[in-house]
């Protein structure tokens, strides 16, 4: 049973640092519908926030609200090493606090740090300060290279995030 993570990869730093993510959310919804991804089926649409970018929790909130209103689950991929980029930690933590009592706005969290050699021996992704490592759903812990091909090495702690894939 193969699953695909649907990742919006054409975001810009100017866009994600703005206060309104509705336009990006609508683009993600349109792209999902064009692919035939069913709505109201629990499928996550991920926003990839590049490691060096600044992001606004208001952008995250309106992006997530737009996806939820269209029947999708929000997902965020971000630099979870606060020593490299404290902005994602701070803004994601503001998002967590703002949405704490709204279950449908609970996104799928995908950590990108730390990098480790090989398969991690224990579940220890870095996370925003408002979350615990156990609340990180996926962890991109490294890169695998096969000749000219490069692939991210990603892990899940439990199978439930796969239910959010298409």
Where do the model's predicted regions map?
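Extracytoplasmic/secreted cell-surface and envelope-processing proteins
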Residues: 13-18, 53-59, 83-90, 95, ...
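Short, structured secondary-structure boundary patches
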Residues: 18-31, 87-109
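Functionally critical loop-and-helix segments that line ligand-binding/catalytic clefts
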Residues: 93-166
């Amino acid at each position: 049973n193969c699953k695909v993570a649907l990742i919006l990869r054409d975001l810009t730093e100017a866009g994600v640092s703005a206060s309104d993510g509705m336009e990006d959310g609508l683009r993600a919804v349109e792209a999902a519908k064009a692919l035939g991804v069913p709505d109201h089926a629990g499928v996550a649409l991920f926003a990839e926030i590049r490691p060096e970018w600044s992001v606004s929790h208001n952008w995250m909130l309106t992006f997530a609200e737009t996806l939820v209103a269209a029947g999708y689950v929000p997902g965020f991929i971000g630099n979870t090493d606060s020593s490299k980029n404290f902005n994602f930690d701070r803004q994601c933590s503001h998002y967590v606090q703002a949405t704490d009592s709204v279950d449908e706005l609970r996104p799928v969290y995908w950590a990108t740090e730390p990098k480790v050699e090989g398969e991690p021996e224990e579940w220890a992704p870095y996370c925003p300060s408002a979350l615990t490592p156990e609340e990180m759903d996926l962890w991109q812990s490294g890169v695998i290279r096969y000749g000219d091909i490069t692939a991210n090495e990603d892990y899940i702690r439990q199978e439930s995030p796969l239910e959010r894939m298409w």
